[in-house]
């Protein structure tokens, strides 16, 4: 979260599920409960909203540090099959479009 804050990132793209064939592929660095806050050093992270969008999940976060607040959105692609590739590219293109269109022109880089 410190890197997100320091580089003024507004968008995070996650291309994997948390587990694949019962093996951890991505550490869950957010709360599962909407409106629950977690503290990471000087940064407080609150999950504001979770939305299921078919092939991906959209999460809206509020980051607070030193009385300053920023919004960050995370997109997690969940349609990637275990140990394989998607049958078609359409779901991945929809995911990419959602990620790119959510990126403000003045923001830092997209974190993948």
UniProtKB/Swiss-Prot annotation:
Keyword match Hydrolase: yes
Name under which the protein is recorded: Tyrosine-protein phosphatase 17
Gene Ontology MF terms in the entry: protein tyrosine phosphatase activity
Class of the enzyme per the UniProt entry, highest EC level: hydrolase
Annotated gene: STY-17
Coiled-coil segments on the chain, per record: none
EC numbers, comma separated: 3.1.3.48
The organism's place on the tree of life at top rank: Eukaryota
Ranges for domain Tyrosine-protein phosphatase: 1-112
Lineage: Eukaryota, Metazoa, Chordata, Tunicata, Ascidiacea
Catalytic activity: O-phospho-L-tyrosyl-[protein] + H2O = L-tyrosyl-[protein] + phosphate
């Amino acid at each position: 979260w410190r890197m997100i804050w320091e580089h003024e990132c507004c968008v995070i793209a996650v291309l994997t599920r948390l587990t694949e064939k019962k093996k951890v592929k991505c550490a869950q660095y957010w709360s599962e409960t909407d409106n629950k806050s977690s503290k990471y050093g000087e940064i407080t992270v609150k999950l504001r909203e979770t939305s299921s969008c078919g092939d991906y999940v959209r999460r809206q976060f509020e980051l607070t540090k030193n009385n300053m607040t920023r919004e960050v959105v995370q997109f997690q692609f969940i349609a990637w099959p275990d140990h394989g590739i998607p049958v078609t590219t359409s779901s991945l293109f929809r995911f990419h479009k959602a990620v790119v269109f959510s990126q403000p022109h003045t923001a830092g880089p997209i974190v993948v």
